Amino acid sequence: DRLRSRGLGDVYKRQMERTLNWLDRCAKAHGREEQMLFPIIQGNFFARLREESAKATIPYAKCGIAVGGLSVGEPASLMYEMLDVLQPLYPENMPRYLMGVGTPDYIIEGVLRGIDMFDCVLPTRIARNGTAMTSKGKVVVRNACYKEDFSPLDENCDCYCCKNFSKAYLRHLVNCNEIEAAMLLSIHNVNFLLKLTENIRTAIAEDRLGEFRENFYRDYYNKGVN
């Protein structure tokens, strides 16, 4: 059960309890050692329910813990508030997985709040719509300004797309509805997020995650950190 909007607390409590009942049945049925089972913390946007769900869910966690029901249209500040509630409760020796999150800012803010893993259709979905994520922000490739731009999507990227194709050629593919456009932009966008998480790991190891966050927001979103 993905809990999507604010409302009466008892309604969401029943939904959370239904999820916990399913988790118990799933754990009892799960017998494949080669398959990982990540129990999912729910609770809508109520701190009390999130805490209750976490405390009931964590005992089932053997290899990792997931957080669901966030990034479903709520303000970013509300998602961050729920992650702040959960951060002290996670097991320290297991990865934490935030479901359905794929924008660079959500990834960075999630890491700052104890998250290790993310998944999302975003990089391939926006690729199908002709949009690329770059070190200087989003590039809408179909725009006319790229008609005679023979530079790569991102001067700082070493992916197959950036090494071999220009913005002008990619724009041609997008505007002709060629499937290669979605393929090449997907390669680039996935590589961009892999490089982002690699850079985050390096910043953590060098104890400069705050500085990295500030610089990334300035370059990608053309704004400072709120």
PLM features per residue range, with description:
Residues A29-F38, Q42-L153:
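Glycine-rich phosphate/ribose-binding loops and adjacent secondary-structure elements
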Residues R14-R25, P59-A66:
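Acidic, His- and aromatic-enriched active-site or binding-groove loops in soluble protein domains
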Residues D10-E17, L70-A76:
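Glycine-rich tight-turn/loop motif centered on a GG-T
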Residues D1-Y12:
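Single conserved hydrophobic/aromatic residue that forms the stacking wall/gate
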Residues D154-N226:
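C-terminal extensions of enzymes
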Residues D10, G64-S71, I179-A182:
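Glycine- and acidic
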Residues L20-A27, Q87, E198-R201:
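Structural signal for well-ordered, non-membrane alpha-helices
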Residues M16-T19, R50, M79, K163, ...:
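Generic structural signal for well-ordered, non-membrane alpha-helical segments
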